Amino acid sequence: NHMGVLGSDNAWWLNVLEHGPASPYADYFDIDWYPLSPQLRGKVLLPVLGDHYGQVLEEGDLKLCFAPEQGEIYIQYLENSFPVDPREYPRILDLRADILRTGLGTEHPDTQELATLSDALRRLPERYSAEAESRAARVRDGTVYRRLLAELCARSPEVTAFLQENIMLFNGHPGDAESFDSLHQLIEAQAYRLAFWRVAADDINYRRFFDINDLAGLRMEDPAVFGDTHRLIFRLLSEGRVNALRIDHPDGLYDPQMYFRRIQAWRDWR
């Protein structure tokens, strides 16, 4: 019925935060992508902040980070990591590009490859594409481009240092509100909206387990969701390593009767 989210270890949820409605897992979670609030259209509200967003931002508690080994850019808040939409990577890759060209040379292969990667990332399909092929291409190609960025950083310490310096420029300086403008604009461009935890009761747009923000509801009535979430369980049953199941909180399911019937027919779902 629900799954732990809001940490940094749920690959499905992180994929949704990265790609929004284009994620192959967007329909796995019970998310209202078109709530009444126009600020949340196509976004997931994340009520994880300990204070109002503006206050947290200007205190420097939201940090833009870069992991060169994975070619990933993300936003860090306490123990939570939030992926950055790969289509927005050029904001960082293109910053001060003239400095890299001056240092390495315009014709240097690393300079040219970074520019090529930035252009490719910029051309990724948007999160809101209605075409299944475009959504799949976005996720697939975004992963490929991140890997290529990681490979470039692995062989070019100059590019790695350049990108890390750009990241530092985004992070601003507490006491200087304008220094956080670029980071704010980047956060606003994501498929999620970071918010004070107290707003969850009124604004949250994903189903939770009771009122626990980090337990997001799953659409277990969807056969694909049921199959993927129960694959390990059914394998353990077939291997004889499990001989009984305890079903907790079935009343929270969309269709409890259907769920029990599928469980009883578990051999058909292996």
Which positions does each model-derived feature cover?
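The substrate-binding groove and active-site-proximal loops of carbohydrate-active enzymes
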Residues: 213-223, 249-250
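N-terminal small/glycine-rich loop or linker at the start of catalytic domains
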Residues: 201-218
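Short, acidic/polar
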Residues: 223-238
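Structural preference for beta-strand elements that scaffold enzyme active sites
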Residues: 242-246
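Short amphipathic alpha-helical segments, especially helix-boundary/capping motifs
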Residues: 205-210, 234-240
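Acidic/aromatic-lined carbohydrate-recognition and catalytic surfaces
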Residues: 1-201, 239, 249-270
